[in-house]
Structure formats: C-alpha cells, structure tokens
C-alpha cells in the first residue's frame, strides 16, 4: 500500500533530467547555477534555514541577527536570579555516622620447638660464623640479614673482624659464541659445477655476505648435479628471485633429498613457486620453509596443504602453520606418507 506522498512522487520517476536541462535557456541555466551555489542541502554545519531557499510567502516582520540573539539570551540568563529553595538547607546531619570497623590485629604465636639434646648442645656451642653458614644452607634469609651478624666477632686467629653477609654463588659457566660457518662458498660452487662425487652435502647457513647472483648459480649448478643430496641456505638473506631459481631447479633435479630455506626474506610468491615445483619433483623428501620475514597468509597455507595431500613423497615439512585447518591437513598427509614408507620397508623385509 503506497502512502499519499509516494503516489505524488511516482510521476517524477521517468523524467529525463538531460532533456529538461536542454530546454532551459542560458539565462535560466545561470540562474540555476546561482541557486545551487548559494544552497547546500547536504551540509550539516549550516542552520536549517540556510540549506534551502526560503519558501515562505510572508514578508519579514523585522531583521534577524543570530549573534545578537545569542548575546541577548546569555545576558538575560546572567541577570536572572536563581530560584530560592523551598526548604532551606540547615546543615543538620540525620541518621547514624558511618564508623568503619577496626580489623583485628593478627598476632603470631611462637611455637615451641623441642630438639634432641645432641642438637641443642651443638647449636649452643656453635659460633656465629657456623650459625651464619647454617642459615645460608637452610635459606633462612631473615637470619642472614640480622644486624647481629654484622657485629665484630673473634675469628680463629684471635683477631676481630666483621662477619661478611655475603653468600657465594656458583660460578657461571662461560658461553662461547658459535664459530662462523667454515664452508668455502666459491670452492663449493666449483665442486658442484664439476659434479664432484665427494660433495654430497652443502651447508651455507648463516653466511650473510653471499651475493644473490651467487645463490642463483648454486641453484643452476644443482640442475645438472647428480651427487648433492642435502642443500641448506638458512639465514642467508635469500629473497624471492633466489626462491624462483631453486623452484626451477626442483623441476629438473633428480638427486636432491633435502632443501632448507628457513629464516630468509622469501614472501608468499616465492614459497608458492617452491610448492608448485614439488609437483614435478619425485626425489625430494624434506623441505624447510619456516621463519620467513613476513607471514605467508591463509591462501598460501591452503595451497601448501593441497600440494602435500597430492604429494606422497614428502616425509618431513618444516613450517609452523598459523591456521588450524591447513595444520591438520598437513599433519594427516605427512603421517600418511610416512606410513606408506614404513609399509614398503616391512614388505621388503618379509621378502
């Protein structure tokens, strides 16, 4: 059911505004522009009377000055006396005055301790220094801070000196810094390019000054190398171009078993490239990608989970998922892959 004012507006729904503006003359258009410039219906800072054109037909009975009106109202409010109270305030207090209850003071009663005669005799004949050592062993800190033990006592050599209120602690074991990575980067790169059979593991961890082109050369050398089984470049400041180079390597390499790219500057795009490359790799069983500079995000984690569900060769995956869904899916996929390897091993032993 339409309201009366809505029925009156229905005839304006199909009006073409462009056609109406085209019929106006230049003088009418200028007049319309002046009206629109003076009025601003959407401005909440203007009073209601200034947001639209005055539509009243009556002539003004007098001038209106808003500032003058405000000053007049303020003056009248200050000159008008406050209304007197119907019941004057006498200051009389009625009712009972609140007095807080005093909390009972807890008094500790000293318990009488009875010792064996031998212990009483030993404590009675013990010197202050021996009692101090005994308190240190028992951990009685109140006795250690007693001023009595700061007084001068006679030592075994007949000289007087203060009992030192210091308990010797255990010596701290020195912790030495880890030595730098001894790997020779250039020599390892040349060995990989020469496909040296003695080089089966390359560890570049924590070497910060390896140039990005050199890391790409390592990835290029791994494409044709048939002996390196484990490659690690954690904390080498590797970025997405390095990750893309290693992704291309994984599509070709048929020997590498383990790859570690943890603690680097690889973003979600680089990680996705590595994950997609695993679909074409049949030999890699372990990959570590955790602790990158920025979080990978939910979309990347879901792609990783889907890849691992389709890949039956990855046995170890190093990454701490932030979402419960991908974490559960990956854990189930890794468990399934390890179970398949165990079943194959058991069947081989039976044969």
Swiss-Prot record:
Q: Does Phosphoprotein appear among the keywords? A: yes
- Tissue localization of expression: Neuronal-tissue specific.
Example GO molecular function = tropomyosin binding
Q: Which GO terms describe its cellular component?
A: cytoskeleton; growth cone; myofibril; striated muscle thin filament; synapse
Enumerate the UniProt keywords alphabetically. Answer: Actin-binding, Cytoplasm, Cytoskeleton, Phosphoprotein
Localization (cell): Cytoplasm, Cytoskeleton
Has the keyword rRNA processing been applied to this entry? no
GO annotation, biological process: actin filament organization; learning or memory; muscle contraction; myofibril assembly; neuron-neuron synaptic transmission; pointed-end actin filament capping; positive regulation of G protein-coupled receptor signaling pathway
Phosphoserine is carried by which residues?
A: 25
Q: What subunit structure does UniProt give?
A: Binds to the N-terminus of tropomyosin and to actin. Binds to TMBr3 as well as to other low molecular mass tropomyosins (TM5a or TM5), but not to high molecular mass tropomyosins (TM2 or TMBr1).
Q: Give the protein's biological function.
A: Blocks the elongation and depolymerization of the actin filaments at the pointed end. The Tmod/TM complex contributes to the formation of the short actin protofilament, which in turn defines the geometry of the membrane skeleton.
Family per record: Belongs to the tropomodulin family.
Name used for this protein in its record = Tropomodulin-2
* Organism expressing this protein natively: Rattus norvegicus
């Amino acid at each position: 059911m339409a309201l009366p004012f809505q029925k009156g507006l229905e005839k304006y729904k199909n009006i073409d505004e462009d056609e109406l503006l085209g019929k106006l003359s230049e003088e009418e258009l200028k007049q319309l522009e002046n009206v629109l410039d003076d009025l601003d219906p959407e401005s909440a800072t203007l009073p209601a009377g200034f947001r639209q054109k005055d539509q009243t037909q009556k002539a003004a009975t007098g001038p209106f000055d808003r500032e003058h009106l405000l000053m007049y109202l303020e003056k009248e409010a200050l000159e008008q006396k406050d209304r007197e109270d119907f019941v004057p305030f006498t200051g009389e207090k009625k009712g009972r005055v609140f007095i807080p209850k005093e909390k009972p003071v807890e008094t500790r009663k000293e318990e009488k301790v009875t010792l064996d005669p031998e212990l009483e005799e030993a404590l009675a004949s013990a010197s202050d220094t021996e009692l101090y050592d005994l308190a240190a062993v028992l951990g009685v800190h109140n006795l250690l801070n007693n001023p009595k033990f700061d007084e001068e006592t006679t030592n075994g050599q007949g000289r007087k000196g203060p009992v030192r209120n210091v308990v010797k602690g255990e010596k701290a074991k020195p912790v030495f810094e880890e030595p730098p990575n001894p790997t020779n980067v250039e020599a390892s790169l040349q060995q990989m390019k020469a496909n040296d059979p003695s080089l089966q593991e390359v560890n570049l961890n924590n070497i910060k000054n390896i140039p990005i082109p050199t890391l790409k050369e390592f990835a290029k050398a791994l494409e044709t190398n048939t002996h390196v089984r484990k490659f690690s470049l954690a904390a080498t400041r590797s970025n997405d171009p390095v990750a893309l180079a290693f992704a291309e390597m994984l599509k070709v390499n048929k020997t590498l078993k383990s790859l570690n790219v943890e603690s680097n500057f690889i973003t979600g795009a680089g990680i996705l490239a590595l994950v997609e490359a695993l679909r074409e790799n049949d030999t890699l069983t372990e990959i570590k990608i955790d602790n990158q500079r920025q979080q990978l995000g939910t979309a990347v984690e879901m792609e990783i989970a889907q890849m691992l569900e389709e890949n039956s060769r990855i046995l170890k995956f190093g990454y701490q998922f932030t979402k419960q869904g991908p974490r559960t899916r990956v854990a189930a996929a890794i468990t399934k892959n390890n179970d398949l390897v165990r079943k194959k091993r058991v069947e081989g032993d039976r044969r």
